[in-house]
Amino acid sequence: MTTTEQTQPDQLGTLRDRVTFVTGGTRGIGAAICRALAGAGAAVAAGYWHQHERAQQFHDEMLAAYPGSEFTVHEGNIGSADDCRRVLSEVIDRHGRLDILVNNAGITIDRTVAKMTDEDWQRVIAVNLSGAFFMAQAALEHMLERGSGRIINVSSVIGETGNIGQVNYAASKSGLFGLTKSLAREALFQLGRAGHPVSDGIGLTVNAVTPGYIATDMLGTIPDKVLDRIRSQIPVGRLGNPGEIARVVCFLAADESAYITGQIWAVNGGLDM
């Protein structure tokens, strides 16, 4: 059955023979990204933490929805540098290579500044920002050896606007902007030093996508009155759906995006205008 989260027919095959790894890939936006990448022909590995039954269920759903596709799930704590390196190595060992990394994993621990503990701050930064760095660091080493690759960081409109009670989350997501731009510059610099021409082929690019308010489980705890107020502030008048984020990620992962790097792609219904 076709859903808004699945890739449209004209996208099929654009990522054939590519291997992708999506952190936080078994639910919400991450699951939609996995579906879109698989629909475009890629072999997909999805990262998760703790939720074994959900991960196995999603694994089975993916194999049923995309017969003949390669799809694996890998458990790891994104907040641990050692786990990041281990999981990425596991993905490469399993699939033989890595072409595309999507840093999607993220958590929230919401508190006002006065009530936020050291652990509240450090945990969110560790998963949302440090984890993205450690994953990208390990992926870049492999991609530079091969001479090509894609890294796509999933940030948030909250990283641009800030939000009461989310200073840790906003800081982590804003940090991804600087991480993206610096990685993009360094990737091309190192690519040239390694003797790979930066002007030919698909290149090695790093970009970010900044979703607005997307209809996922993460919004499930927000009261209806608050959601109505949020909708009223969005120029297009509605929440986004995960598939709309996934389609942008698919484009940035494709060869056709080779001239785009170090950029922040806002997908938020005009919320930041």
Model-derived regions: residue spans:
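Active-site helix of classical SDR
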Residues: 136, 172, 180
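Conserved glycine-rich cofactor-binding loop
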Residues: 19, 26-27
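Residue(s) in the substrate-gating loop at a strand-loop-helix junction
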Residues: 156
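Substrate-binding pocket helix/loop in short-chain dehydrogenase/reductase
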Residues: 112-113, 120-125, 151, 219, ...
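Alpha-helical segment proximal to the catalytic Tyr-Lys
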Residues: 141, 185-189, 197, 258
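Conserved glycine-rich Rossmann-like NAD(P)H-binding loop of the short-chain dehydrogenase/reductase
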Residues: 40-57
